[in-house]
UniProtKB/Swiss-Prot annotation:
InterPro entries: MCP_chemotaxis, MCPsignal_dom. SMART domains: MA (SM00283). One of its GO terms (cellular component) is cytoplasm. It is found in: Cytoplasm. This is Frizzy aggregation protein FrzCD. Methylated. Saturated fatty acids capric acid and lauric acid stimulate methylation. Short-chain alcohols, such as isoamyl alcohol, and some other solvents cause demethylation. GO terms for molecular function: transmembrane signaling receptor activity. Residues 144-380 form the Methyl-accepting transducer domain. It comes from Myxococcus xanthus.
Length: 417
């Protein structure tokens, strides 16, 4: 028993000594809880957007003072960083607004935005390079627009002049083509007329040859009556000289034919006076008259060309009327008729040859004219196409000029210097 009592006393002292330690632990726990709550509240306040919130030192215990101090420093740095970000964002917004405003207004010469923030410097420098690039671009486009406008105006002027020239050329070619068409028709008509003249000349030549044969018979009959042909030769020489003085051979035909008709009539009259002896003479005179009338019928188609022949025939008839002797008159007139027929043959031959030459020439002219008309038609078609192309080029040049002017107006909105 006595041994147990001493053992119990020391145990009671131990419990007495442990009581203060438990009280201190409770105090420390309360202080830690208060510090934790203060820190937590502060962090929640910061997270809600209040960057000025700090951990109150009076709300933390001794153990949390150092932690609160460190946390407040961190919050200070965070707030400063957020402030710098905010300032940088404002400067960026201002720079962007300034850039957009300059682009909207077109005045690129007023860009001079600077910053003291080393982090924003490269960004603003990049903006400055963009502006400088835009300035260079605007200047180059402006110069190009001016050159384009000048070139477009020159092209438009040249196209307009070319269009005018093409239109005038087309009108001239059209008029020339119309003239050539008229010439073509005229050449065709001339060719037809020349062919008709050639045919009539051939017919007249045949009639003249027939008349020459009849005149030969008549001369033979005259020679049987009268052998003296000196006066007839003189008359023929005079008539030949007169015929040579006549300007156109065709007119001689009508004159000689008319004269032959009168001579035949006179010969018939003389033959009638001679009675039975002049019967053969009358027959030949009648045949000569018939042939002369045939020649007259043939020469009616070229009446306008043989007026002088009528005059010569009339002159020969007048000379025949002056003859007192029927034999001499018949002999002279027969010789004159023979010479006249020879002249007619020569003249008709020349006329026929000339008509053939003219006919050939007119046919060649007609062919050449048709070729020229065809060529002019092709030229007119090409000219029409050229005129249309010129009008299209003028329209394109005018549109290009308008576009160049529009581009110049747009570029004027931007000021690079």
């Amino acid at each position: 028993m006595s041994l147990d009592t001493p053992n119990e006393k020391p145990a009671g002292k131990a419990r007495a000594r442990k009581a203060p330690a438990s009280k201190a632990g409770a105090t420390n726990a309360a202080s830690t809880s208060s510090s934790t709550k203060a820190i937590t509240d502060t962090l929640l306040t910061v997270l809600s957007g209040n960057l000025q919130a700090r951990v109150p030192k009076e709300l933390v215990g001794e153990s949390g003072v150092e932690l609160a101090h460190l946390l407040n420093q961190v919050l200070d740095q965070f707030a400063a960083s957020e402030h710098r970000k905010h300032v940088a964002a404002q400067e960026i917004d201002q720079a962007l607004d300034a850039l957009i405003g300059l682009v909207r207004e077109g005045d690129l010469s007023r860009w001079n935005t600077t910053t003291e923030d080393p982090q924003l410097g490269p960004l603003l420098e990049g903006f400055g390079k963009v502006i400088e690039t835009l300035r260079t671009f605007v200047r180059e486009i402006n110069e190009a627009a001016l050159r384009l406008s000048s070139s477009a105006n020159q092209v438009l002027a040249a196209s307009t002049q070319h269009e005018t020239s093409s239109t005038e050329q087309a009108a001239a070619i059209h008029e020339t083509t119309a003239t050539m068409e008229e010439l073509k028709h005229a050449s065709a008509q001339i060719a037809e007329n020349a062919g008709s003249v050639a045919r009539v000349a051939e017919e007249t030549l045949g009639a003249a040859r027939a008349g020459r044969g009849a005149i030969g018979e008549f001369i033979q009959a005259m020679q049987q009556i009268r052998s003296d042909g000196v006066a007839v030769a003189d008359s023929i020489a005079k008539l030949s000289k007169r015929v040579e003085r006549i300007g156109t051979v065709v007119e001689v035909i009508d004159e000689i034919a008319d004269r032959s008709d009168l001579l035949a009539l006179n010969a018939a009259l003389e033959g009638s006076r001679a009675g039975e002896a002049g019967k053969g003479f009358s027959i030949v005179a009648a045949e000569m008259r018939r042939l002369a009338e045939n020649v007259l019928d043939s020469t009616k188609e070229i009446k306008n060309l043989i007026t002088e022949i009528r005059e010569a025939t009339a002159a020969a008839a007048g000379a025949a009327e002056a003859s007192k002797s029927a034999t001499e008159s018949g002999e002279k007139l027969g010789a004159v008729a023979a010479q006249a027929v020879e002249g007619i043959l020569a003249g008709v031959q020349e006329t026929s040859d000339a008509a053939r030459v003219i006919n050939l020439a007119t046919q060649q002219q007609r062919t050449a004219t048709e070729q020229v008309v065809a060529s002019m038609a092709e030229i007119e078609d090409v000219t029409r196409q050229t005129t249309q192309a010129s009008k299209q080029a003028t329209g394109a040049a005018a549109e290009l000029t308008q576009l160049a002017g529009r581009l110049a107006e747009l570029i004027k909105r931007f000021k690079a210097d």
